[in-house]
Amino acid sequence: MHARLLGLSALLQAAEQSARLYTVAYYFTTGRLLWGWLALAVLLPGFLVQALSYLWFRADGHPGHCSLMMLHLLQLGVWKRHWDAALTSLQKELEAPHRGWLQLQEADLSALRLLEALLQTGPHLLLQTYVFLASDFTDIVPGVSTLFSWSSLSWALVSYTRFMGFMKPGHLAMPWAALFCQQLWRMGMLGTRVLSLVLFYKAYHFWVFVVAGAHWLVMTFWLVAQQSDIIDSTCHWRLFNLLVGAVYILCYLSFWDSPSRNRMVTFYMVMLLENIILLLLATDFLQGASWTSLQTIAGVLSGFLIGSVSLVIYYSLLHPKSTDIWQGCLRKSCGIAGGDKTERRDSPRATDLAGKRTESSGSCQGASYEPTILGKPPTPEQVPPEAGLGTQVAVEDSFLSHHHWLWVKLALKTGNVSKINAAFGDNSPAYCPPAWGLSQQDYLQRKALSAQQELPSSSRDPSTLENSSAFEGVPKAEADPLETSSYVSFASDQQDEAPTQNPAATQGEGTPKEGADAVSGTQGKGTGGQQRGGEGQQSSTLYFSATAEVATSSQQEGSPATLQTAHSGRRLGKSSPAQPASPHPVGLAPFPDTMADISPILGTGPCRGFCPSAGFPGRTLSISELEEPLEPKRELSHHAAVGVWVSLPQLRTAHEPCLTSTPKSESIQTDCSCREQMKQEPSFFI
């Protein structure tokens, strides 16, 4: 179906552009220079679309700089995207990376085609409609060009909506009947709007620009009041509202993740009233009713009726959530329930059709191809191991500024990371995205090499893992605590220290079923202690855990601690679990088996209330303080670790600690006092 839809899109685009060029030549050959120059001027916004397409090609790492530039200068950049997507879709057996590339190619193509249709086809449609009406329907060339432009613009809207829907997790196949109803809906609404504006221009000329400008301002203020969160920057958000307000002069597009029934009804009611007023003024119906005026008004408004009927049929019968939508409308009309609660996420129809998907996108784990990884930046495993912390941060920033990340937000109609995380989930199958800045061939080669050279985490050299982390990344982690995830450990440099492994180097993606937090043990003055790593999960708090036991005999001198960092990268909704850092050393006391042993709140001693520890001053140690020598009396191979996990989105800053208890468990009787328990086993949340 991908190939057929791409073929239909290419056929409509070829017909529309051929008719447009023939119309320009027709005007110049017949001596109608004004219309010829106006039709030629409409082609100028196409250079903006070609420039954007070229930049996106370069952002994707496409080779061939000179040839690519020449194609875009000749206005063939969108056609090249058609060709690439067609070649990819015609492959009989698409592997996961190819399916991922096909979906990204289709998303880029649909967005560029919609932009080209709005900038070129829309003005050309208005111009040719006016020329065709001014000639009293006798000039065939403008009429044919009007028909193709009308169909092409409507299909661009349908194609954009369809491909954006494919980027959502759990998407369902859209039948041809649904596409046909959407095409009728778009053509009916668009035709009525264009005819109303053109007829009003024939009667009042440039006053139509006042009407269009007033409609633009009203729609822009309405968009501002709706508070769409797709764009984060304030300046870009205002520009986005202005551009969408201009689009709303002709057609409607939804940019909100909430049910849009009320918004759509409001928009089309306003459009209907405007069209009726424009038609009444254009046909002089108020001055005296005539049969011709009635025919004109009825003919124009019949398109609105056809579009409305097609819209109702699509959302009541052919939409994946049509059952919920229809039942919600009935409940609201009967007064049983109101509001926008009709489009629930777990609809019966969507559940029944979930197993009947006929189209899907690539997967890196199995036969289920859902584009859930599009909402997540590349993991540190996709970055070369020799790259430092700065390289990984640059990769994450490039992903968040990449245009494919914009498609994710437009598909889900939100820029809220929490909502994107909830939509894509943690365990849904996904295809592995290409590394940004690499071409498809380079990505496939790198993926094959990485699969061959991948070794188990237990066989990795700890010294290599420690050297791969850069010390200069610490200020970055401190300056940006809300968007980074860092693991910092301090280990003493003893000669006979047991080999340890950097926990962050073997991080994987956690699941909701894994453990609560990453726990790291710390050894103070004494002879026993150990370090254990737990599994991590998504959390909006920072968990710090330490264990210390008082000893009586130890004469070893401690050396200055060394700092080890491993940046795990920004994860959208997933924390990376910390694996066990070292084997259990012989002779060290075991870590407490239950949470009650390490919590001053869950203890059963005489002082079970939370008592602030004297060793916790409520501030973060500086680098100079961390580099000071440890206490003189320490056992060999003693080390302390601090595990810090920050997941997006962060709900509170690092300057606002949240003190709470550890997860509840059965209390174990202890006979130590509150002060001794706080000194030996401090555990708290930051």
Swiss-Prot record:
Locate the compositionally biased regions of type Gly residues. 523-536
Where in or outside the cell it occurs: the entry states: Cell membrane
Q: Where is this region: Disordered?
A: 339-387, 448-468, 490-592
Q: Which organism is it from?
A: Homo sapiens (Human)
Transmembrane stretches, by residue range?
33-53, 205-225, 239-259, 265-285, 297-317
Q: Which family does it belong to?
A: Belongs to the XK family.
Please report the name of this protein according to its UniProt entry. XK-related protein 5
Cellular-component GO terms for this entry: membrane; plasma membrane
What keywords are annotated for this sequence in UniProt? Cell membrane, Membrane, Transmembrane, Transmembrane helix
Biased region (Basic and acidic residues) positions are: 340-359
Pfam families associated with the record: XK-related
Topology within the bilayer: Multi-pass membrane protein
Q: Which stretches are tagged as biased composition: Polar residues?
A: 450-468, 490-509, 550-567
